[in-house]
């Protein structure tokens, strides 16, 4: 019996957990976005 891979891609889960709205919904998430803006990231979130 082989063990399954841990990464099972799903766009819905990706957006719900790491999307812009998810980041904006918490204070810490907004800190993440602020850091990424300061760094000059082209993409702020998933």
Swiss-Prot record:
PROSITE patterns: RIBOSOMAL_L34
GO biological process: translation
Pfam families according to UniProt: Ribosomal_L34
Region of interest called Disordered, as start-end residue ranges on this chain: 1-46
Biased composition (Polar residues): 1-11
Extent of Basic residues compositional bias: 32-46
Keywords, ordered alphabetically: Ribonucleoprotein, Ribosomal protein
GO molecular function, one term: structural constituent of ribosome
InterPro entries: Ribosomal_bL34, Ribosomal_bL34_CS
CC terms in the record's Gene Ontology section: ribonucleoprotein complex; ribosome
UniProt family annotation: Belongs to the bacterial ribosomal protein bL34 family.
NCBIfam families for the chain: rpmH_bact
Official protein name in the record: Large ribosomal subunit protein bL34
Organism, scientific name: Xylella fastidiosa (strain Temecula1 / ATCC 700964)
